[in-house]
């Protein structure tokens, strides 16, 4: 059963090639980072919570030659603003933010 550890072995650290903030509502601005293959299959990384944020380690679980790795900080989390805000911060808002980010990129 030595194959399982090989499958879980992360890829080397990878710098983001694009990052910024996207205004998704009058109140909220989400932070995002893009790395990997610019023409690759999109892989959207959704971090845990509550209050967490994207971490560089998360992108290590995707092959950067195959995937365009997109990470973002959900409303109220990480480098998104306003920090720790619960206003207009529901699952429906999260889905809408992901769609807005997809269209932007």
Could you describe each region identified by the protein language model?
Residues 6-10, 56-59:
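Intrinsically disordered, low-complexity boundary segments flanking structured domains
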Residues 92-105:
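Conserved acidic catalytic loop of the alpha/beta-hydrolase fold
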Residues 81-95:
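Catalytic nucleophile-loop/oxyanion-hole region of alpha/beta-hydrolase
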């Amino acid at each position: 059963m030595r194959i399982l550890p090989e499958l879980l072995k992360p890829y080397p650290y990878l710098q983001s090639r694009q990052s910024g903030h996207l205004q998704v509502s009058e109140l909220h601005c989400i932070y995002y980072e893009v790395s990997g293959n610019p023409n690759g299959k999109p892989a959207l990384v959704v971090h845990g919570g509550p209050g967490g944020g994207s971490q560089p380690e998360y992108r290590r679980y995707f092959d950067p030659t195959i995937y365009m790795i997109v990470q973002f900080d959900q409303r109220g989390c990480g480098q998104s603003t306003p920090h720790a805000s619960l206003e207009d911060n529901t699952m429906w808002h999260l889905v809408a933010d992901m769609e807005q980010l997809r269209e932007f990129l």
